[in-house]
């Protein structure tokens, strides 16, 4: 028989740096999950992605066990890393803060493809380019 799901928790955590401190502790604690067990497992699986924010979906079962699925980092985080900037523009339509190439957009789109509801790499690239524009990043040919 399948385990009964009692909760789904969605968090965005820095890769390899999950700790029982907020926001992890309170979110997992209210469902009775072993917080240290989750932190150790998450940190082990994300150790090679240091510096990125990793979204994670944790499924909590009735017997207090859990499983989790790692998603790809948000497009904005990948774009900031590719452009080498700390944050996007406050006024993206007026102030442009950086430039990225089509090749960088393609690379990010290929990374994000499993989590995007895009049929082809071209549509995924246009989604990523839209995110870049809304952050004040210019896309060059």
From Swiss-Prot:
Transcription is among the record's keywords: no
SMART domains registered for this protein in UniProt: RL11 (SM00649)
InterPro entries referenced in this protein's UniProt entry, alphabetically: Ribosomal_uL11, Ribosomal_uL11_bac-typ, Ribosomal_uL11_C, Ribosomal_uL11_C_sf, Ribosomal_uL11_N, Ribosomal_uL11_N_sf
GO molecular function: large ribosomal subunit rRNA binding; structural constituent of ribosome
Keywords: Methylation, Ribonucleoprotein, Ribosomal protein, RNA-binding, rRNA-binding
Record GO cellular component, one term: cytosolic large ribosomal subunit
Subunit and partners: Part of the ribosomal stalk of the 50S ribosomal subunit. Interacts with L10 and the large rRNA to form the base of the stalk. L10 forms an elongated spine to which L12 dimers bind in a sequential fashion forming a multimeric L10(L12)X complex.
NCBIfam families the UniProt entry points to: L11_bact (TIGR01632)
Membership in a protein family: Belongs to the universal ribosomal protein uL11 family.
Functional summary from the UniProt entry: Forms part of the ribosomal stalk which helps the ribosome interact with GTP-bound translation factors.
Annotated protein name in UniProt: Large ribosomal subunit protein uL11
Organism: Clostridium botulinum (strain Hall / ATCC 3502 / NCTC 13319 / Type A)
């Amino acid at each position: 028989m399948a385990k009964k799901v009692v909760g789904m928790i969605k968090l965005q955590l820095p890769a390899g740096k999950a700790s029982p401190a907020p926001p992890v502790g309170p979110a997992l604690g209210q469902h009775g999950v072993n917080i240290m067990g989750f932190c150790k497992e998450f940190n082990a699986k994300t150790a090679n992605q240091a510096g990125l924010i990793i979204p994670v979906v944790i499924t909590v079962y009735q017997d207090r066990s859990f499983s989790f699925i790692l998603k790809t980092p948000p497009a904005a985080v990948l774009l900031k890393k590719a452009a080498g900037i700390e944050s996007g523009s406050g006024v993206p339509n007026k102030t442009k803060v950086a430039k990225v190439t089509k090749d960088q957009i393609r690379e990010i789109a290929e990374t994000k493809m499993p989590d995007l509801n895009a049929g082809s790499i071209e549509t995924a690239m246009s989604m990523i380019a839209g995110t870049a524009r809304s952050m004040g990043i210019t896309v060059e040919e």
